[in-house]
Amino acid sequence: MRRGRRRKAMIVLWGCVAALALCAAGALFLLLRTPQPQEVEIPGARGNIPATVQMPGKLARGGEVPLVVLCHGFTGSRLGDGHFEPLAAQLAEQGVATVRLDFAGCGASAEPYTAYTLTNMAADVDSVIAWMREEYGVDGPVGLVGHSMGGRLASLYPQLGTQAVAALALWSPANGTGLQGLEFLNIEDFSQVEAVAAEAEANGQAGTKWGVEISADFVRQMRESDPNAALRACGLPVLLTYSGQDAVLSEATMAGTVSTVQSLPGGTVETGLFAQGDHNYNNADAAVDAQLDADLCRITTEFLTAQLKN
């Protein structure tokens, strides 16, 4: 009789231990698991801003949660040519929150493309940073990732924006001085770029071969901006990448920006990894394309984690 009772007690005990282990494993999984990205509408100065939020898992946070804002390029979207989602996932694993947004006239934005200006983009970044702090309790330092025109915006943001930022990652920024920053509109003939700019300034807007109309405000703000001077003035840590098969930016623009970032105390330049990439860090060969994405996300994650988490 006693043995039977003892055996039943042991069975119950082991059952309780197993149940506790399962509960602990489940709780640990929930703490470690990276939450699913959330599609949101963020209130902005001109209306709602379509965006995607990626928060880190609870255990990955480890105190303050830094934030990185991902800024796409001209006629782009928050997909970031396929690079923003994997980058956001990798940053989340390191305890860094991200928000990627559609600027005016791009992606799911309801605004016309003529609202796509540097000051409007900076205002949108202001709005999403403030909203992330209020809605998600993000309380750590902020970094920006910008591709192409988004890289120009990120370079200028310390001058144009109202929120403090601690680091910049620039992917092939369109950082030519003044109107040279619009060279991608017609890289073969800059006189055509000047003609489009003049038309926009005369008529309020002008069409482009990219299928969108740019505004006089955008042209004026481009003409008056010098992103490399802004980088030198802000003195922030900067990661700069350029690809080897970029067909929309001039060698002069790339060389000037490389020289600027190399002169910064916290400047890092990486071009060798991307010799086979185009302006969007893509390649027709699937294996090469995957490696470009992996390298781009890896070095950006390493840089931002080092700057924002330490």
Show the residue positions of the predicted features.
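Active-site glycine-rich loops that stabilize anionic/oxyanionic intermediates
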Residues: 65, 72-77
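Conserved alpha/beta-hydrolase
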Residues: 88-110
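N-terminal cap/lid segment of alpha/beta-hydrolase-fold proteins
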Residues: 29-62
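Catalytic nucleophile-loop/oxyanion-hole region of alpha/beta-hydrolase
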Residues: 42, 78-80, 106-139, 290-291
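Glycine-rich nucleophile elbow surrounding the catalytic serine of serine-hydrolase chemistry
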Residues: 146-156
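The serine-hydrolase catalytic nucleophile loop
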Residues: 76-88, 103, 252-253
